Design a protein with these regions (language model features):
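Short beta-strand element of the alpha/beta-hydrolase
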Residues: 7-17
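The serine-hydrolase catalytic nucleophile loop
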Residues: 19-31, 45, 237
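Conserved alpha/beta-hydrolase
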Residues: 32-52
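Alpha/beta-hydrolase active-site loop
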Residues: 58-79, 290
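Alpha/beta-hydrolase fold nucleophile elbow
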Residues: 79-92
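Alpha/beta-hydrolase-fold enzymes
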Residues: 99-184
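Short beta-strand/loop motif that positions the catalytic acidic residue
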Residues: 219, 225-227
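Catalytic histidine-centered segment of alpha/beta-hydrolase-like enzymes
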Residues: 273-286
Length: 302
């Protein structure tokens, strides 16, 4: 809550990255935006962190979307929140989830998707769509089915592992960036799956068999997608933005109508920034706080 707050204020719900906890990036975003005049909440998604749900470290497109909607429910019922001025911020995989939530709930008046992933696309197609084939998906489905059967037989859940540790010398640049955040004092947290043993082996299976951004071309409320120029994930944000605006884009196997309200949509590329630079600024002040604040205040006006 902002210091010296009076009356009903605009509010923001924040979550992400995918596999992180609120004490990491989302807490930073929530704190910073509170300092800029918003009531904010950063939350752990269901099955992770300090939130409840079994089995632990399980992800679900519908439940994760509902997590955002539940946060909006909570904010809308607070006496100090103007229920007509609620926004959401999603980071990394939660950027895509935020777009899905915005497509579903008109109470969300503005959405910022920061360094976003489309988790349904990467889970089903692999990075850079390298595994976008029936054969690759069938192989993955067989492996998941075998893992589920083994877990049931053994009565325990195997874990997929968080960020690789030790870090191979030949690891891709973005994996090294993940390591530099999640596995060092810069961003490590004991409850973070990414910092420790990751998701349950079959925990993200549901994302691989769905395409949950189908209706984002119908989002009427304001949307800001922010990506780093050098981010490996940049293609997720650019494709989602094009599809949201035009109803068609590379990586989306469906074509729909253009957005009915295109004037309040924005794609912002940060020069020189990597994916993880937008987690905490990367020590170089890469997060465009002023742009995010301006976007939210403009679109949360009464």
């Amino acid at each position: 809550i902002p210091k010296n707050a009076e009356g009903k204020l605009p509010a923001i719900a924040v979550s992400g990255p995918f596999g992180a906890v609120k004490e990491q990036c989302s807490g930073l975003y929530a704190q910073t935006m509170a300092e800029r005049g918003f009531i904010t909440i950063a939350f752990d998604p269901s099955f992770t962190g300090e939130s409840t749900g079994e089995p632990r470290r399980t992800a679900s497109p519908d439940i994760n979307t509902e997590d955002f909607l539940a946060a909006v429910d909570y904010l809308s019922m607070r006496d100090d929140v103007d229920a007509g001025r609620i926004a959401i911020i999603g980071i990394c995989g939660w950027g895509g989830i935020a777009l899905n939530a915005a497509a579903q709930d008109p109470r969300i008046k503005a959405t910022a998707a920061i360094t976003m992933y489309d988790m349904s696309r990467v889970s089903g197609n692999g990075y850079f769509d390298a595994d976008d084939s029936e054969e690759s998906r069938y192989s993955a489905r067989k492996a998941w089915a075998e893992a589920r059967s083994a877990d049931l037989k053994n009565g325990t859940f195997t874990m997929a592992g968080g960020v690789v540790d030790p870090l191979p010398e030949n690891a891709p640049r973005f994996v090294k960036d993940y390591y530099a955040y999640y596995k060092t004092p810069r961003g490590y947290h004991k409850r973070s799956g990414n910092s420790n043993d990751g998701w349950r082996t079959t925990g993200c299976q549901a994302y691989a068999n769905t395409r949950f951004l189908y209706y984002i071309n119908e989002i009427r409320s304001a949307v800001l997608i922010v990506h780093g120029e050098k981010a490996h994930s940049r293609y997720f944000g650019e494709s989602a933005f094009r599809y949201m605006m035009d109803g068609k884009a590379e990586g989306y196997d469906f074509a729909r109508k253009p957005n009915p309200v295109p004037v309040n949509k924005q794609l912002l590329i940060i020069p020189g920034a990597s994916h993880c630079d937008l987690y905490d600024g990367g020590g170089k002040g890469m997060i465009p706080w002023d742009n995010i604040e301006e976007f939210l205040k403009k679109n949360l006006k009464r």
